[in-house]
Amino acid sequence: MLRLSLSPTYSLGFHLLAMMTLLISHVDHITAETEMVEEGNETGECTGSYYCKKGVILPIWEPQDPSFGDKIARATVYFVAMVYMFLGVSIIADRFMSSIEVITSQEKEITIKKPNGETTKTTVRIWNETVSNLTLMALGSSAPEILLSVIEVCGHNFTAGDLGPSTIVGSAAFNMFIIIALCVYVVPDGETRKIKHLRVFFVTAAWSIFAYTWLYIILSVISPGVVEVWEGLLTFFFFPICVVFAWVADRRLLFYKYVYKRYRAGKQRGMIIEHEGDRPSSKTEIEMDGKVVNSHVENFLDGALVLEVDERDQDDEEARREMARILKELKQKHPEKEIEQLIELANYQVLSQQQKSRAFYRIQATRLMTGAGNILKRHAADQARKAVSMHEVNTEVAENDPVSKIFFEQGTYQCLENCGTVALTIIRRGGDLTNTVFVDFRTEDGTANAGSDYEFTEGTVVFKPGETQKEIRVGIIDDDIFEEDENFLVHLSNVKVSSEASEDGILEANHISTLACLGSPSTATVTIFDDDHAGIFTFEEPVTHVSESIGIMEVKVLRTSGARGNVIVPYKTIEGTARGGGEDFEDTCGELEFQNDEIVKTISVKVIDDEEYEKNKTFFLEIGEPRLVEMSEKKALLLNELGGFTITGKHLYGQPVLRKVHARDHPIPSTVITIADEYDDKQPLTSKEEEERRIAELGRPILGEHTKLEVIIEESYEFKSTVDKLIKKTNLALVVGTNSWREQFIEAITVSAGEDDDDDECGEEKLPSCFDYVMHFLTVFWKVLFAFVPPTEYWNGWACFIVSILMIGLLTAFIGDLASHFGCTIGLKDSVTAVVFVALGTSVPDTFASKVAATQDQYADASIGNVTGSNAVNVFLGIGVAWSIAAIYHAANGEQFKVSPGTLAFSVTLFTIFAFINVGVLLYRRRPEIGGELGGPRTAKLLTSCLFVLLWLLYIFFSSLEAYCHIKGF
């Protein structure tokens, strides 16, 4: 289970913080100090008030002056209610972030037309990543703080309050110090995480510090204590200016304006990735939404000057090899697992390694906290089940098909010339088996002729009720003439149906199309092999492709143009680019022995499966000269079979006869007789002997056209298909989004297991822990309530976006009232309550999200890179919008919008100083001795984390002292 595991230093710090805050808040009451310090706070209030004001929604809890016991009870109720509201905000923010992920994941398809006329299609995201991070993503993660500031101003007659602005500053401090400290510490020892888009980080960090500096300027320098309309509006308009600057830095549009960019296919899912290069050819054209755009058009695709997709990009190959390696390792590690479990494991590993947005980590953290389970594991399991189910699709004709299909069992048949007849099987499948079905058949000449090679045959086959198979026979004519292999055709036609209800067996032809029809194949090809020759031996084709996962490869050796006699055919494997000896295949050699009338033999070769993603290696299988096993002495003489001989003591045609010696381990168990060259006196043969020699030569077994088969070993088709599916980048909008209300309600009432320390066993189904059940029952009310929010499928996520932000605003109003009443009950000022409790509550989901991102992501951008941008957006939106509305309202009434600069200005200044220290330390950590902003050696991690926690504690400490006038403010 994912938990916010803090070191003893963190735990001690939080305990000291709680004690310190309460101590400071009661110092004035204990010493009965009531003096006013003008410099500390213009309102003259240096102590917390026990007098509560009516909230935006919640009324005052009467009486106003309860007993000490009632105060404790009220404070407990307010605190528990506030925590419960924070849980609700986290859950509705989960829906909100899901809608943002769906919105920012929208893509469009573009077509690239190359100079050679080829076209390539790829997809590009409509939203730029940096723009989405600074707008919708930041709004989603900081919506409670922003809305709290706006609601507080609007709900209190457009007067400035301490809760909203202090929450924004306090949340910024928590994000900048505590979240980054945690991210630095949780990275495993020795590992580092660096910010990938450093220039974007510089821009957002600069704007973040400027935002808080700007607050000090407008509060204490330009118009002390008064916020004018132009100041409020300019604060708000800094938001789009900040976004534009970050976008410019991301797209390199200023300094890099004349550096031409090239886009290549990304590692996953065909997404385009930018890199710099030379000026490309101007002939490349890009078609988007049906419009052709020349490759030199500026500002295309977020400022790109060129789009060029390399279909064989090296990164794609690396991604596939990496995925193949993952699958091989999983198979070796879990040989007992089924394919579904292996695909689930691989899916989860791919999803875990895939780069994710800030929104995803926020959603993942919230669901893990609330017992909703790991969305990556659930999605991986769903995808695995779908993949397996696709393999199990039944392609056979359904038995309940209302139409009967009539067809041959197979499309080709073979027979020997001396077989007499050849049998062909006709199949009836589907339809009403109680009907009688008639089908005509007829032979047709091919290279074989009716009357000389086969008997012309035609007729009608009758399938009686219940019959599903019939056999027809065609006569084959034998002769003693050497012939090539010949073939003829048999056609099916004219299907008719007769039902039991028909009278006198009359055929019902009116409903033939709906009752029965011809299936495939409806024509069979019959090949007649000549049996008057010993045979021509050949492979079926010169080249064959096999999958490396085939195991044992079987290759057919055909015997055509005759099948008389027993023949031996030697064979052997020959290395090519594929190596034998068990590396790519096992060396094989031997002999095939064809019996009389046997026309097919198979050679078996073992292929080694080493599970390479792309494989194209070759070896050869070769057959040698065939030879007859049994041969008469005279035929052996006439064929002049040469070899090693021993003297037999016999004479033939006046010549000594020798026995041939075969150089084989297992000689043929027969005697082959011939005459040695040295005994051949070149005596001419008679005409009769010449004729006998010619006839013997005609019947001799010979090699055919394909004697050397090239075997190309390719990657496993199933393995490659699995890899191709896995390397396609899963759109995370599909993972976090929902398609229906039914799906949302099922998720709301389902308890799922959270994260485990052992991710290697993620394929095993685990039961929810006790913590999962506790968090589920604590949050089930919110889950069911917010299941009514429209699914992200509607309006491309905008329906969910609008409803969610309204719900967040409503809950934020409750949180503001509860926090204010909690503070006044125990005597805390709103500024202190906001900086400590409210800021902490609104930042907990971000803390979990950053922790997950720091441990799982390859870079530090998702964990800390967005912190600075989020801090700037909080000021420009949260304070800019609220103060602009209030300033305009007061200006319209001829009044001034007054804001006390004391506490806020002091907090802002303190935060700015500490933020400079924070950013400086992070940049220093990029030096080679540490290697990155996050992680590194254990000592460096611990020192950095302790420093950042100390900065936060000092910020809280000094802000509280200033709020209670113990130190001089501005």
Swiss-Prot record:
Residues 93-133, 189-201, 250-797, 843-871, 925-941 are cytoplasmic. It comes from the Eukaryota. It comes from Cavia porcellus (Guinea pig). One of its GO terms (cellular component) is sarcolemma. It is a multi-pass membrane protein. Ca(2+) 1 binds at E417, D453, D479, E483. GO terms for molecular function: ankyrin binding; calcium ion binding; calcium:sodium antiporter activity; calmodulin binding. The chain crosses the membrane at residues 72-92, 134-154, 168-188, 202-222, 229-249, 798-818, 822-842, 872-892, 904-924, 942-962. Belongs to the Ca(2+):cation antiporter (CaCA) (TC 2.A.19) family. SLC8 subfamily. NCBIfam families: caca. The gene is SLC8A1. This is Sodium/calcium exchanger 1. Mediates the exchange of one Ca(2+) ion against three to four Na(+) ions across the cell membrane, and thereby contributes to the regulation of cytoplasmic Ca(2+) levels and Ca(2+)-dependent cellular processes. Contributes to Ca(2+) transport during excitation-contraction coupling in muscle. In a first phase, voltage-gated channels mediate the rapid increase of cytoplasmic Ca(2+) levels due to release of Ca(2+) stores from the endoplasmic reticulum. SLC8A1 mediates the export of Ca(2+) from the cell during the next phase, so that cytoplasmic Ca(2+) levels rapidly return to baseline. Ca(2+) 5 binds at E548, D610, E612, E715. Ca(2+) 6 binds at D584, D610, E611, E612. Keywords: Antiport, Calcium, Calcium transport, Calmodulin-binding, Cell membrane, Glycoprotein, Ion transport, Membrane, Metal-binding, Phosphoprotein, Repeat, Signal, Sodium, Sodium transport, Transmembrane, Transmembrane helix, Transport. Ca(2+) 3 binds at E417, D479, I481, E483, D530, D532. GO terms for biological process: calcium ion homeostasis; calcium ion import across plasma membrane; calcium ion transmembrane transport; calcium ion transport; cell communication; intracellular sodium ion homeostasis; positive regulation of bone mineralization; positive regulation of the force of heart contraction. Disulfide bonds: none annotated. It is found in: Cell membrane. SMART domains: Calx_beta. Ca(2+) 4 binds at D453, D479, E483, E486. Alpha- repeats lie at residues 138-178, 839-875.
